[in-house]
């Protein structure tokens, strides 16, 4: 009798914690069949098998298409926000860059952030109080809706809600050794079925010790340019105002956004050498200003307990002023090149989606239409104009379900893309099939295979026929003959979560034929850069991730390593690259104190004849939480003379070009952070907005 009561109690607690979550539901267009539920109710590894409920001593739960990570109360007590919480929880294959306020996958792919299934930003994560975070969902195998994007993973934070009262918070992160500031402020009010919110965030940089080193070699010249320390800075601002209304089976959401960007202090001075002899100097000064208002409308009508109809519309206007000035003196001969461009881009995205779910089967379908109109007016040394119109109609459908412990998903997307600029135009239909099968013989072990075909569409800048002189030795130009091509992707995955360990292994293969990529050639003694057509490409990536709880819920260590291989072929030429990336962190938290030591060596990436170099980072930081305030102190990139922020390399027979941008201010940077938050009100679980679109293309050909 006593044992029966204990089992009943555990079952009741588990179902209560998940508040009716044992059902079919959707996230975006990814249908999820709720399967075995695990909850960290004790530190033991004892398992109670209660129908389809499993209670186990781990806060990492493996689902059919995602991981669920449950933050412990100790993690929440030691964190200042949901963003801070991300660095204390084990996200397999995710690099959390605390300094630059960003997160990517091991191989550098983009991650989409969400809060309660609504598209969000890192600034939004800073507005979430840790105690309001119920769970963190991590998706690294996405469905048909995202098969036309460059998103490879999703981090969704599920939070508590408030029906009355409100929330207010401030966040400030400043460097003590240089001028680097990050500011954030927000306020939220709830009244009956309505929620009002207003937020502001900005990022300001004003460095004095940055420089760029370049080297150029072709058939006629061998020029190296040694960077002279120059100022580097920018100022980004973002304002959001939102209103949400929910009653019964209807939800309405409207969001206004206004963002500005000022890059007016990014000068580059260089000394020019012909082989080893100093022959002159150069000065480059790009300036960029932009502002963008946007509006996002969303509504959802729940037809029945099994069906929903959703609608989303996003409108955006982007205006940009860009000026590029270059001057050099070589052997007492002066030359100067300058151009300006005033750009305006108007875009509209509309989407409608229908969802339907049964006991062991889910199905959804949607239609999304994008339209954009871009105008670029050039001045000074470039007299061409660039006016384009592009359209994209994407229809998708997907089903998913399970048979016992085998989970399956299949879907297809069909694209119609249209582009017109002057006399150049194309219309093309693209197909985006995908499928996935996952086998879970144990609740803590899974293996899966996923296939997808993702077409790549050329950007506006690569299609532009405008030629721009970079200096007397180099130029770059667009290629109006480029056309979309198909990427074939395969992914094999294994994951195992025994007691204190978590282990994952992924093998990715990507291939394409008749594609376009970066190229270099020589014309009249000058090196030219242009996207050109290649015959084929092959990409192989193997990444391994592991984490271990040294002291459970207090001290853990994780690490990753990735092998990356690229090969591109054009006629009888082959370009290849093999590279490794690795990193890890040690995290300690106890009561209101936490400490974090991390390092990340970013990978190189080959795209045709051009290799890209990312920024490798390291940090040591700690924080202490006192009532509603949190104080943090950190050292970023310790024991370094400089930080290589970015770089690239072109290589071809007889042609070579390298460029490395380095910032001394980012080395040994000491930062101080202060945050304050307060909230009041009662909690409730609101309906989730599940459709989100945005136009992140600037459309300005620089």
Model-derived features: positions:
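Face-selective signature of the C-terminal outer-membrane beta-barrel domain
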Residues: 236-263, 285-424, 428-434, 438-448, ...
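Surface-exposed extracellular loop regions of Gram-negative outer-membrane beta-barrel proteins
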Residues: 418, 443-490, 507-526, 639-655
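Short acidic/polar hinge/loop motifs at secondary-structure boundaries
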Residues: 118-143, 185
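Outer-membrane beta-barrel translocator/receptor signature
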Residues: 148-155, 163-211, 234-237, 249
């Amino acid at each position: 009798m006593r044992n029966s009561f204990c089992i009943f109690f555990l079952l009741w607690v588990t179902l209560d914690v998940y508040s009716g979550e044992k059902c079919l539901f959707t996230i975006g267009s990814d249908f999820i069949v709720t399967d075995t539920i695990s909850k960290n109710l004790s530190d033991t590894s004892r398992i109670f098998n209660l129908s389809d409920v499993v209670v186990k001593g781990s806060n990492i739960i493996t689902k059919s298409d995602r991981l669920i990570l449950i933050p412990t109360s100790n993690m929440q007590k030691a964190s200042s926000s949901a963003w801070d919480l991300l660095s204390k929880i084990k996200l397999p294959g995710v690099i959390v860059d605390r300094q630059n306020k960003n997160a990517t996958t091991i191989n550098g792919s983009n991650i989409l952030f969400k809060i309660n299934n609504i598209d969000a930003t890192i600034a939004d994560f800073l507005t979430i109080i840790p105690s309001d975070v119920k769970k963190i969902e991590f998706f690294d195998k996405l469905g048909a809706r995202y098969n036309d994007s460059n998103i490879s993973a999703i981090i969704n934070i599920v939070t508590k809600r408030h029906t009355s009262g409100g929330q207010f918070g401030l966040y400030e992160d400043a460097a003590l050794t240089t001028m680097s500031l990050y500011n954030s402020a927000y306020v939220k009010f709830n009244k009956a079925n309505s929620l009002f919110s207003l937020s502001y965030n900005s990022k300001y940089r004003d460095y004095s010790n940055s420089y760029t080193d370049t080297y150029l070699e072709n058939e006629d010249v061998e020029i190296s340019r040694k960077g002279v320390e120059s100022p580097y800075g920018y100022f980004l601002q973002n304002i959001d105002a939102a209103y949400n209304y929910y009653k019964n089976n209807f939800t309405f959401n409207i969001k206004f956004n206004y963002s500005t960007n000022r890059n007016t202090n990014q000068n580059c001075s260089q000394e020019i050498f012909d082989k080893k002899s100093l022959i002159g100097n150069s000065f480059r000064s790009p300036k960029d200003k932009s502002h963008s208002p946007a509006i996002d409308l969303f509504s959802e009508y729940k037809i029945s307990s099994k069906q929903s109809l959703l609608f989303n519309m996003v409108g955006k206007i982007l205006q940009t002023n860009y000026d590029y000035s270059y001057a050099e003196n070589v052997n007492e001969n002066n030359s100067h090149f300058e151009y300006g461009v005033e750009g305006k881009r108007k875009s509209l995205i509309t989407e409608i989606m229908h969802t339907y779910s049964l006991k062991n089967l889910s199905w959804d379908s949607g239609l999304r239409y994008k339209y954009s109109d871009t105008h670029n007016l050039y001045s000074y040394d470039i007299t061409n104009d660039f006016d384009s119109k592009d359209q994209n109609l994407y229809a998708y459908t997907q089903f998913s379900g399970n048979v016992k412990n085998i989970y399956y998903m299949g879907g297809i997307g069909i694209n119609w893309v249209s582009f017109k600029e002057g006399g150049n135009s194309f219309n093309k239909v693209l197909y985006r099939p995908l499928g996935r099968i996952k086998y879970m013989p144990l609740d803590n072990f899974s293996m899966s295979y996923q296939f997808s075909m993702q077409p790549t569409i050329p950007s506006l800048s690569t299609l532009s026929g405008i030629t721009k002189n970079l200096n007397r030795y180099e130029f770059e130009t667009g290629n109006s003959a480029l056309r979309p091509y198909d990427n074939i992707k395969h992914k094999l995955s294994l994951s195992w979560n025994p007691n204190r360990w978590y282990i994952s292994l992924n093998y990715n293969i990507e291939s394409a034929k008749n594609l376009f990529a970066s190229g270099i050639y020589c014309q009249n003694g000058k090196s030219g850069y242009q996207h050109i057509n290649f015959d084929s490409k092959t990409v192989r990536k193997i990444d391994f991730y592991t984490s271990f709880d040294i002291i459970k819920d207090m001290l853990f260590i994780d690490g990753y390593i990735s092998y990356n291989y690229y090969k591109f072929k054009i006629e009888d030429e082959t370009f290849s690259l093999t590279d490794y990336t690795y990193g890890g962190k040690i995290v300690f938290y106890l009561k209101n104190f936490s400490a974090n030591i991390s390092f990340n060596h970013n990978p190189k990436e080959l795209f045709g004849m051009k290799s890209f170099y990312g920024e490798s980072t390291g940090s040591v930081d700690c924080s202490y939480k006192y009532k509603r305030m949190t104080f943090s102190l950190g050292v970023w990139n310790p024991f370094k003379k400089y930080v290589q922020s970015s770089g690239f390399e072109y290589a071809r027979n007889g042609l070579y070009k390298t460029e490395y941008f380095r910032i001394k201010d980012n080395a040994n940077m000491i930062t101080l952070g202060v945050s304050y938050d307060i909230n009041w009100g009662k909690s409730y679980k609101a309906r989730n907005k599940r459709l989100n679109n945005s136009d992140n293309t600037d459309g300005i050909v620089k």
